[in-house]
C-alpha cells in the first residue's frame, strides 16, 4: 500500500470511527440505483448521496454508466444500508430527495465512489459536510492514480459545481 493510500485509509477510518456512534444511522433497503449518485429505497423514498456528484446518464456524459454500475455494486438491490444525515447540510434537495451519506458495513459509499473515480466531491454552495476531508483525500488519490473517470474522460470539476465529463 502506498503512503497516499495509507493516508486516505487512515483519514476515512478516523472520520468514520469518530462519527458512527453519534451519527444517528437509519436502516433502509435499496430497491435500485437510479444513477451514480441516487438510490431508490423500499420505503418509496429516494436518496441523493450527499456531497458527491456523478456523471449524468440522461446527458450522455462520459463514465455515467460505469458510475451507476459502481453504485449498484456497492449498494445492490435488496441490500440493507445505513443512512446518515449531516446536520450541517439540508435534509432534502429541491426534488424532495433525502440528502444522506450511505453506509454499507464499515464503508462510506459516498467516499468510496469518489475514491474509485466514479464520482467527485460536490460541496453545494461551498458548504462542506462531515466527510469533506475524506472526500477531498479520496478525489486527490483518484486523480493522481487516474482511477475511473479521471483516466477515461476529460473531466471538468470544481468542488462547488457539478461534475461534467466527456470522452477523451
Task: Label each residue range with its predicted role.
Residues 2-168:
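Small beta-barrel nucleic-acid-binding modules, primarily SNase/OB-fold domains
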